[in-house]
């Protein structure tokens, strides 16, 4: 197993938990982004910089991931592609995406995009994502510990 991190938007707290888990379990963690992210020197931590552009990091992760690998992302279409390749998906808020819940998440995402596109939902009507807090950190740490042993 390897841990693939969609690193463009991973919170610093989650990044630190991924690093600690990778080192504790001797699991390779590959951080993928379109700009370098500072990582401490370790043979278990890899920073992969992809060219700038729409979904370049996502495409790279999907291309490289193997069945049984874990991806850390909150990107629902990326999560779907990873699941199609036999990977596992954990969000930084501790939600595990699987074949039983990903289609519902995709449908809801598409529905909300349609509502925004037609003007039914104004940007100010959407609550957006809450700040990353202690509850999120604990849920993520618990999920990570369960999936990476």
UniProtKB/Swiss-Prot annotation:
<dbReference type="InterPro" id="IPR003791">
    <property type="entry name" value="UPF0178"/>
</dbReference>
<dbReference type="Pfam" id="PF02639">
    <property type="entry name" value="DUF188"/>
</dbReference>
<comment type="similarity">
    <text>Belongs to the UPF0178 family.</text>
</comment>
<protein>
    <recommendedName>
        <fullName>UPF0178 protein Psyc_0274</fullName>
    </recommendedName>
</protein>
